[in-house]
Design a protein with these regions (language model features):
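IMPase-like, lithium-sensitive Mg2+-dependent phosphomonoesterase catalytic core
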Residues: 1-199
Length: 199
């Protein structure tokens, strides 16, 4: 899935997968009142993104390359502490739906378009009822209703710390978000081997 996401505070329609990455960067910069070189794009560090990265570098904008976790990369656009303005690139469609669900909870814009590598994938999409193979899906189409997003870190990442094994317990870090209230809860869990023990 091609993915394009920005956090809250931008005018509706500031991003559009039908436009080039450079045009999207320029639109985001104009909405922010800065030069394109002041925009930071988060991109999954994969060979398939070589042309995208080259285009962004030619434009002069900053690039934050991540090794994995494009859901966390999309969520990063909502966190002012990351300084990331936009997420761009291709990744799995299920992850696109998860990222859209998180953005529904905290605000932002997301667009996704299915990418097909071969005729078998196109045929499978047709069997699932996908008739427009070039359709651009918007946030509300991918995550509608009273969305609740929950994630727990398994390994350390940019969004959550991974599972830590201690002498008498295991600790976890989770986030739970709800669209209807905009509530975000960060949960640090202690899972004890025996009741009454502490970490």
């Amino acid at each position: 899935m091609d993915k394009l996401a920005v956090g809250p505070g931008y005018p509706e329609g500031v991003i559009d997968l039908a436009r080039s990455p450079s045009d999207n960067i320029r639109a985001i910069a104009a909405a922010k009142g800065v030069a394109p070189g002041d925009i930071i794009a988060c991109v999954l560090d994969r060979p398939r993104h070589a042309d995208l990265i080259a285009e962004l570098r030619a434009l002069g904008c900053g690039i934050s390359l991540i090794s994995d976790g494009d859901v966390a990369g999309v969520i990063a656009v909502t966190d002012p502490d990351t300084t990331i303005d936009v997420y761009m690139g291709q990744g799995g469609a299920p992850e696109g739906v998860l990222a859209a669900a998180a953005l529904r909870c905290v605000g932002g814009q997301f667009q996704g378009r299915l990418v097909f590598r071969n005729d078998d994938e196109r045929a499978r999409a047709a069997r699932w009822g996908v008739t427009d193979l070039d359709r651009i899906y918007h946030l509300e189409e991918l995550a509608s209703g009273d969305v609740i997003f929950a994630a727990t870190g398994v390994t350390d990442g940019t969004l959550l710390k991974g599972v830590k094994r201690r002498r008498d317990c295991i600790t976890t870090e989770s986030v739970v978000m709800r669209a209807s209230t905009g509530t975000v809860r960060w949960v640090k869990g202690e899972h004890h081997r025996e009741p009454g023990m502490t970490c």
